Amino acid sequence: MATLTNVTFGGTAWIPQFVQSINQTKCIGCGRCFKACGRDVLALKALNDEGEWVEDEDDEEIERKVMTIANRDKCIGCEACSRVCPKNCYTHESLN
């Protein structure tokens, strides 16, 4: 299988690393990664105290919010999300 390699503007070879998972136990829901990603890959979702997903409208049930991968196919492999994550929640992989 061929390696997907890109080149930066300066000519440096670069292998994209695509988002694979987010450690939701470590995630504090700060939203930094969401702001860094302009590709609509991520979504902030709410959890209740039992760890079940709840709709944002149910504010009284929300225990905390965590980031999720909403559109993995839109990831371009830039790793901007993980570079700004204060808790190192992201796992990335190349297409190899």
UniProtKB/Swiss-Prot annotation:
UniProt domain 4Fe-4S ferredoxin-type: residue ranges: 18-47, 65-95
Positions with a binding annotation for [4Fe-4S] cluster 2: C75, C78, C81, C85
Cofactor: [4Fe-4S] cluster
Keyword 4Fe-4S among record annotations: yes
UniProt entry tagged with the keyword Electron transport: yes
SUPFAM superfamilies named among the record's database cross-references: 4Fe-4S ferredoxins
GO molecular function, one term: metal ion binding
InterPro entries: 4Fe4S_Fe-S-bd, 4Fe4S_Fe_S_CS, FdIII_4_nif, Fe-S_Ferredoxin
Keywords: 4Fe-4S, Electron transport, Iron, Iron-sulfur, Metal-binding, Nitrogen fixation, Repeat, Transport
Superkingdom in the source lineage: Bacteria
Amino-acid positions noted as binding [4Fe-4S] cluster 1 in the UniProt annotation, renumbered to this chain: C27, C30, C33, C37
Cofactor note: Binds 2 [4Fe-4S] clusters.
Entry's Gene Ontology BP terms: nitrogen fixation
Stated role: Ferredoxins are iron-sulfur proteins that transfer electrons in a wide variety of metabolic reactions.
Subunit description: Homodimer.
NCBIfam families to which the protein is assigned, alphabetical: fdxN_nitrog (TIGR02936)
PANTHER family for this protein: ADENYLYLSULFATE REDUCTASE, BETA SUBUNIT, FERREDOXIN III
Protein name, as recorded: Ferredoxin-3
Organism: Leptolyngbya boryana
Gene (name only): fdxB
